[in-house]
């Protein structure tokens, strides 16, 4: 009887822990989405002026012509 009680309590704890971690994961995903929205940037399309590759949508800036390729 003691073994059955221990198994039952262990199963209850595992179920509760799994449900709790799923809830936390959903909030984590929402928080990271909000964080990413703050870091979104506008980019320059191909042919536009640029000073570095990070300004271009395709991440390539020609240093010879200072344009996004």
UniProtKB/Swiss-Prot annotation:
GO cellular component: extracellular region
Tissues where the protein occurs: Expressed by the venom duct.
Residue positions assigned to the propeptide: 18-41
Annotated compartments: Secreted
Transmembrane segments: none
Signal recorded as keyword: yes
InterPro entries: Conotoxin
Top-level division of the source organism's lineage: Eukaryota
Pfam families: Conotoxin
Coiled-coil boundaries: none
Annotated disulfide bonds: 43-57, 50-61, 56-68
Signal sequence bounds: 1-17
Alphabetized UniProt keyword annotations: Disulfide bond, Knottin, Secreted, Signal, Toxin
MF GO annotations: ion channel inhibitor activity; toxin activity
KW Signal (keyword) present: yes
Additional record remark: This precursor corresponds to allele E1d or E1b. Has not been merged with other alleles since they may differ due to geographic variation (see strains in PubMed:19606224).
Domain notes: The presence of a 'disulfide through disulfide knot' structurally defines this protein as a knottin. The cysteine framework is VI/VII (C-C-CC-C-C).
Family: Belongs to the conotoxin O1 superfamily.
Name listed for the protein in its UniProt record: Conotoxin Eb6.9
Source organism per UniProt: Conus ebraeus (Hebrew cone)
